From Swiss-Prot:
The protein's name in its UniProt record: Phospholipase A-2-activating protein
GO molecular function, one term: phospholipase A2 activator activity
PUL domain location: 537-798
The UniProt record lists the keyword Lyase: no
ARM repeats, residue ranges: 550-592, 593-624, 625-673, 674-719, 720-759, 760-799
């Protein structure tokens, strides 16, 4: 085993113990703080999960609990911290059967199973209050609260291999096979991080503002949550599967397909530990700094810095013997091209290495042996026998990784004997001449070498056929390799609860609008509670809030004025204007008559005027939509979709603010009657997505209308058992409350929050996990209007 000391010291990691039990690959390990001492949980392709605890006073661990519940390979594991509902915490595992199983510490069978993903669940992360984030090959992330799915994160175009929750800020991270990382807040994608050149496989949070990612491109990147990549770490020579931080430190450990774990101190790889297994899938760090590693040979190995916990001499020797007998394919390591005749003999090992983990090849009895330098022990240690060679003698169907991409060959080209050598990657499907030309261009080499390089490629690949990997077996599933985006399941986004499409989180569209804050249509803005403030004065609110004030004569006068400017084919005759006058009269005074079909037909024609002329017509619609006949006409099952689409089009962030405002108020007033309420619940995804887009419009009246619309949604959702709908509305409220500043809008958002969570423990816990309490606390110091402070106090007491 290779060892290396930290900078300025002799400390290095050595084997503590090897744990046998799993029968196939160990795919995930997680520190288990639920158990006193240094316990951890492992999961495997053998379909089992196991809880391991220290075997005091020995150096090893014993298997305390074996858990089963998956019908296929188990891919990932995480620990849910203690909560009011489960004071001892829980263990969650994700599997190839598309399910998440949740266990207690003393249960062999799941307490409950989370269903909803449509492909392998490959990553899990826990947050506060029982929140769980999962990632899947179905390209989505899902947020769970106890046994319910609260929201689905859609936006990636390939498998979500890694997830992580930043609980203090209510943020979530997802890493994907589409090479991107996304930052989510309250169910919406706030930022996409680009830079990795291949699948993102692992994530680790450093603090509230920084995190690490690892990738199939053989690199680790350090990011700020604001988007900047601070540093890139290179050292591994193949896919990096996992990254894990040391306790209270920015140092970390990584595992890779190159058969190694690597320990990084102060940004440098200070120790490389080779394992006698091809794929080192996973790792976790215990509170005492010991490293737990799971690999493709089914063995869990624990490494320690502590002299008190190091394995016996016999155990270490057995480990090194096993390592020395391993066979190494040069295409999977950092061995370079091998020319057996040019290799030195054993005498070459008398020269010390220059860095920890340095690899040296020697020729011994006709075989090629690989040795690795251990700085900590000051010796070369055999890490295996090299089988085959890279370059012209490649005979296997394997692929070579170079700069994060796979190739059939990676040649070493010495164009000039006195100059440096260069790597030339090549796939058998490529044109040798084009590859040679690009190689010379990239390395700024003389074009006169074109024929020579192209001929070299042709000569050294003669008789070979393109690698199709038809025989490849995925080490996770046992089937063919997962190709990002090629899932065999249907990823059309069907909602697991409704059968309809999921809410797709939208990103904010930045716009800078300026508008007078005065409301030209309704006068005073403030919604006032019908009773004096008492502990129950504000929520749950049970009746929709509407915009009722109107001046029919002014509205009709403006209509007549704009009618003169309308295109000839759109102008209304005097008789039609009279119909609108009658409609307004009935809408304002329901006892004054009945609404006629002619009046409704005229209204629909006038609201289809050009957008710069329609705002008084929209005001007629806003007032009259509260009438049951008008509401039924526009919001019925047959016509409702067209009506909703029309208003949503007017709410475009690039549209006119008067139209945006009146469209929002029309939606608010539509809740007054059952047809409108039903329509808006059906159209909730589209409407709330548009609400989020409009939050940056700089107009307080629009913000008040947005808040009122969400309040009316909260009133509807309070009456039904729809946790996903409540999660969606909570997400929208959390997004809008970050932006708006008008205190009347804030008040209505607070009432909406209180209405949503009243009497619903799940909604209350979700609000906590989204960090809503910190948003509420910002307004506790408001003294006027007093209702804002009072709502904040009541909400915080509930949470």
């Amino acid at each position: 085993m290779s060892q290396a000391g930290r900078d300025g010291g002799d400390s290095c990691y050595r084997l503590r113990c090897s744990l046998l039990g799993h029968e196939l690959d160990v795919r995930g390990v997680a520190r288990c703080p639920l158990w006193p001492g240094e316990g951890f949980v492992s999961v495997s392709r053998d379909r089992s999960s196991r809880l391991w605890v220290p075997d005091s006073p020995n150096r090893g661990f014993i298997e305390l609990q074996r858990m089963s519940g998956h019908s296929n390979f188990v891919s990932c594991v995480c620990i849910l911290p203690p909560s009011d509902l489960y004071p001892r915490g829980l263990i969650a595992t994700g599997g190839n059967d598309q399910n998440i199983c949740v266990f207690s510490l003393d249960s062999e069978k799941p307490l409950y199973t989370l269903k909803g993903h449509k492909n392998t669940v490959c990553s899990l992360s826990s947050g506060k209050f029982g929140t769980l984030l999962s990632g899947s090959w179905d390209t989505t992330g899902k947020v769970w609260l106890n046994d319910k799915c609260m929201m689905t994160l859609q936006g990636h175009t390939a498998a979500v291999w890694a997830v992580k929750i930043l609980p203090e800020q209510g943020l979530m991270l997802t890493g994907s096979a589409d090479k991107s990382i996304k930052l989510w807040k309250a169910g919406r994608c706030e930022m996409t991080f680009l830079g990795h050149e291949d699948c993102v496989r692992g994530l680790a949070t450093i603090n509230d503002t920084e995190f690490l990612s690892c990738s199939n491109d053989a690199s680790v990147r350090r990011w700020l949550i604001t988007g900047e990549c601070l540093q890139i770490y290179y050292g591994h020579t193949n896919y990096i599967y996992s990254v894990c931080l040391f306790p209270n430190s920015q140092d970390f450990v990584t595992t890779s397909e190159d058969r190694s774990i690597r320990i990084w101190r102060k940004g440098e790889c200070t120790q490389t530990i080779r394992l006698p297994a091809q794929s080192v899938w996973c790792c976790c760090v215990l509170d005492n700094g010991d490293i737990v590693v799971g690999a493709s040979d089914g063995i869990i190995r624990v490494f320690t810095e502590s002299p008190d916990r190091i394995a016996s001499i016999e155990e270490i020797q057995a480990f090194e013997n096993e390592l020395s007998k391993a066979t190494i394919d040069p295409k999977t390591g950092d061995l370079g091209d091998i020319k057996i005749d040019d290799l030195p003999g054993r005498d070459h090992l008398n020269e010390p290495g220059t860095r920890d983990g340095q690899t040296r090849l020697i020729k011994e009895d006709g075989k090629v042996e690989a040795y690795q330098w251990s700085t900590g022990e000051g010796r070369w240690m055999k890490i295996g026998d090299v089988v085959g060679s890279s370059g012209a003698t490649q005979q296997t169907s394997g692929r070579v990784l170079f700069e994060g991409k796979e190739y059939d060959y990676v040649f070493t080209i010495d164009v000039n004997e006195s100059g440096p050598s260069h790597k030339l990657p090549y796939n058998l499907t490529e044109d040798p001449w084009l590859v040679a030309y690009n190689f010379l261009q990239k390395n700024d080499l003389n074009p006169m070498f074109l024929d020579q390089v192209a001929k070299f490629i042709i000569d050294n690949t003669a008789g070979q056929t393109p690698s199709t990997n038809l025989g490849y077996t995925d080490p996770l599933t046992g089937g063919g390799r997962y190709i990002p985006g090629s899932s065999s399941t249907d990823n059309n986004g069907a909602d697991p609860f409704t059968g309809g499409n999921r809410y797709v989180p939208g990103s904010s569209l930045q716009s800078d609008y300026s508008a007078a804050a005065a409301d030209p249509f309704t006068g005073k803005n403030a919604y006032r509670s019908s009773t004096a403030p008492t502990p129950n004065a504000y929520f749950p609110k049970t009746k929709p809030v509407t915009f009722d004030q109107a001046n029919p004569s002014q509205i009709l006068g403006k209509l007549k004025e704009l009618n003169e400017s309308a295109p000839e084919e759109r102008k209304l005759p005097e008789e039609d204007l009279m119909q609108l006058d009658k409609l307004l009269s009935v809408a304002v005074n329901p006892s004054g008559g009945t609404v006629t079909a002619q009046q409704l037909d005229t209204l629909w024609r006038v609201v289809n005027w050009p957008e710069d002329l329609i705002f008084p017509a929209l005001d007629v619609l806003r007032i009259s939509i509260k009438n049951p006949t008008v509401n039924e006409m526009f919001c019925n099952e047959k016509e409702g979709s067209q009506f909703s689409s029309y208003l949503l089009q007017l709410m475009s962030p690039s549209g006119k603010q008067a139209n945006q405002l009146l469209a929002l108020r029309t939606f608010c007033n539509s809740f007054f009657c059952d047809p409108g309420s039903c329509l808006l619940m059906v159209e909730r995804d589209n409407v709330l997505s548009k609400v989020i887009e409009l939050k940056t419009v700089n107009n307080k009246n629009i913000h008040i209308a947005l808040a009122t619309l969400m309040l009316n949604y909260a009133i509807c959702l309070h009456k039904v058992s729809d946790i996903e709908g409540k999660a969606q509305c909570l997400s929208a409220i959390s997004s809008v409350i970050e932006v708006v500043q008008d205190l009347e809008a804030i008040f209505r958002l607070l009432v909406a929050l209180g209405t949503l969570i009243s009497g619903d423990t799940n909604a209350m816990q979700l609000a906590k996990s989204l960090g809503v309490d910190s948003q509420i606390k910002k307004y506790m110091s408001v003294t006027e209007p007093a209702k804002v402070n009072e709502c904040c106090r009541l909400l915080l007491n509930m949470l």
